[in-house]
């Protein structure tokens, strides 16, 4: 297994808004899964969570609210605000499909499932077109504005990668006709 910094950290758009904290997102990529755990995604997440808790001990609070990713927050000394948080999404190459899959909560099934990740090459080509035409600063400004507003209001309902993807798509559509 290995981890990859994604989202704002990977694109140099880490958010820090006033006294609000900042966050980073990682993909934890599983290169193999023991056969006995192959069809137990919830157990895989529990094992990873327990391992992380042993490593970070009591330095971070475990946010149980997100069913898909694992989130930890480091609070200020007075405990009133988050200074830093990190989200970990669990990714693996699934045995039945060629693409990678992300561990997500499925409401209908009432549990965690492996969901195939759509090919990211389309998004990569949009980013390249935006940069090539000199509009990357629009992405930065719009993303940082949206993300900072969410941090200030402590709205963690939309993952940063979703905000980033929406922002890229919005800017790409706005320059497409130019």
Q: Model segments located where?
A:
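The feature captures the alpha-helical scaffold/lid subdomain characteristic of nucleotidyltransferase
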Residues: 1, 59-62, 84-85, 89-178
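Short, conserved charged micro-motifs
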Residues: 34-44
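Active-site nucleotide-donor binding segment shared across nucleotidyl transfer reactions
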Residues: 1-24, 28-35
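Conserved catalytic core of two-metal-ion nucleotidyltransferases
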Residues: 42-96
């Amino acid at each position: 297994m290995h981890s990859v910094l994604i989202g704002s950290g990977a694109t140099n758009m880490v958010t820090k808004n006033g006294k609000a904290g900042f966050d980073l997102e990682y993909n934890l990529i599983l290169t193999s899964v023991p056969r006995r755990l192959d069809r137990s995604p919830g157990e895989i997440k529990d094992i990873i969570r327990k391992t992380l808790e042993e490593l970070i001990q009591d330095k971070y609070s475990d946010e149980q609210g997100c069913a898909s990713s694992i989130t930890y927050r480091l609070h200020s000394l007075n405990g009133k605000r988050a200074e830093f948080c990190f989200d970990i999404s669990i990714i693996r190459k699934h045995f039945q499909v060629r693409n990678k899959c992300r561990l997500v909560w499925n409401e209908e099934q009432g549990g965690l499932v492996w969901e195939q990740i759509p090919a990211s090459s389309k998004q990569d080509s949009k980013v390249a077109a935006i940069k090539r035409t000199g509009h990357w600063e629009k992405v930065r400004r719009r993303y940082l504005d949206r993300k900072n507003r969410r941090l200030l209001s402590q709205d963690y309902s939309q993952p940063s990668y979703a905000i980033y993807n929406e922002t890229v798509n919005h800017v790409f559509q706005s320059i497409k006709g130019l």
